[in-house]
Amino acid sequence: AGEYADELANLGVRVSNLEKKVGNISWSGNARMRWVQGYDGTEAKDKYDGRIKITAHADVNDSTYVQGRLRSDMNFKDSKDANTYMEELIVHHQFGDKVGVTLGRQDLTLGQTGTYYDDEFDGIIATFGSDKLALDLGYGRFKSWDLKAADGSNTEAFLGRLYGSTGRLSYDAEYINMAYNQGNVWGLGLTANITDKIDVFGDFYKNTDADNDPQVWTAGLGFGHTNWKKPGTFRVSAQYIDAEKGSVFGASTYNVSPIDEAISKTDVDYWLAQ
């Protein structure tokens, strides 16, 4: 309505009246079907499953919104009912242009690639800054990390992230401190755009609380950029991943890879193309 305010005014229609009639809730979603190769030793079994996600976003006022995401999973190899649950539920409040706070179960991707973590975070994250340089300070639980205290309770963690972009570079530095000395992790990531379509990228993380300070790193080369709003766009990439035993806790962005074997079983190193 705002784009055609003058034309509507000439017709005697008040834009403000139209805006009052527009709902403050928006919906979006996606669905997928996939086949996944198993990597759990001799008992590894391939999976063929489906998933649908529906997100609802509601503006409370100009500074606050509530957002929730429902997820339903099903396995095409059995006859069980789909498992439907609330995957994300957050409240976000913006204090001016450069300070915001998000409370609840929220998406969290670490590094340039998500190799170290790409899943939900249960807690609070305060964000300071802008797209060029921002600081996140958070406290809560990494949902997919199976970390327990001596009494069996879940382990909280402090998260600090400094990230941004300038020119052809995108960068981040991260620190994670877990309760009961279960992890003290430092990480760095960098993406350099060589041209408008070609980039090199990498991440590095080290856990200084584990024996021998195990580390995980990845480096790769990518071509193209996927934009879901633009049909025909695509991206292909290849990267090398090296993860020492005890360097990761799970929930990598790569579902079809053996990186979870490095949680407690063995070192892994491999090439990944996508």
Residue locations for each model-derived region?
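Disordered, low-complexity tails and leader-like regions
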Residues: 1-12, 38, 88, 104, ...
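Outer-membrane beta-barrel pore domains
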Residues: 34-47, 76-81, 94, 98, ...
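Short, intrinsically disordered, low-complexity segments enriched in Ser/Thr and Pro
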Residues: 5, 135-137, 160, 268-274
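Surface-exposed coil loops of outer-membrane beta-barrel proteins
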Residues: 75-88, 93-187, 246-264
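N-terminal periplasmic/intermembrane-space "pro-region" immediately following the signal or transit peptide
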Residues: 1-32
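Domain-scale macromolecular recognition modules
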Residues: 24-100
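One-face residue pattern on beta-strands with alternating periodicity enriched for small/polar residues
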Residues: 30, 51-55, 69, 88-92, ...
